[in-house]
């Protein structure tokens, strides 16, 4: 479909997952820029293409924010890894092995090292956790405001809020 706002729903995450492309999901205009820059750095580190999931509610509004440093200060996890660059002469099964066993874990390691997934607020005695990304994260925060729940009252209730920036593959250590 065309890259434009639309009245009909479209979804590409399944195609991106099938192509083994890590997906970042920003919730605000500022995060589109932040995750876009982080996505470039993640791509350099992991050798993978990186996608941004963008929904109409995030794109069809204006906002003001300070631009991050385009050079960025990213942590590149240490450790030995094979050559993860795309090489057209690699046999298909080797390409798949590199993607599944090296590129995707490298993208997860980059997300972990750079705090793309984060605990928004925590509770000393956790009873319930909410995981929300992108637009759904903003909806959850608005629902909390509507219910009169601030971070202190959520902590008292044992509620933890987790916001993944990398929605696929999920970073397992969070």
Q: What do these predicted ranges mean?
A:
Residues 1-44:
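Thiamine diphosphate
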Residues 26-174:
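Flexible, low-complexity linker and terminal segments
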């Amino acid at each position: 479909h065309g890259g434009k706002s639309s009245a009909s729903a479209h979804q590409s995450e399944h195609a991106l997952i099938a192509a083994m492309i890590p997906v970042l999901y920003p919730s605000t205009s500022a995060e589109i820029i932040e995750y876009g820059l982080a996505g470039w750095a993640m791509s350099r580190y992991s050798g993978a293409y990186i996608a941004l999931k963008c929904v109409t509610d995030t794109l069809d509004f204006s906002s003001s924010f300070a631009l991050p440093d385009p050079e960025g200060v990213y942590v590149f996890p240490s450790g030995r890894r094979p050559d993860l660059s795309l090489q057209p002469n690699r046999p298909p099964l080797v390409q798949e092995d590199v993607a599944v066993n090296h590129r995707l874990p490298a993208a997860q390691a980059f997300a972990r090292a750079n705090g793309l997934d984060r605990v928004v607020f925590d509770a000393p005695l956790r009873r319930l956790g909410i995981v929300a990304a992108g637009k759904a994260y903003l909806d959850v925060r608005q629902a909390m405001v509507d219910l009169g729940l601030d971070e202190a009252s959520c902590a008292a209730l044992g509620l933890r809020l987790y916001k993944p920036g990398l929605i696929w593959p999920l970073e397992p250590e969070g």
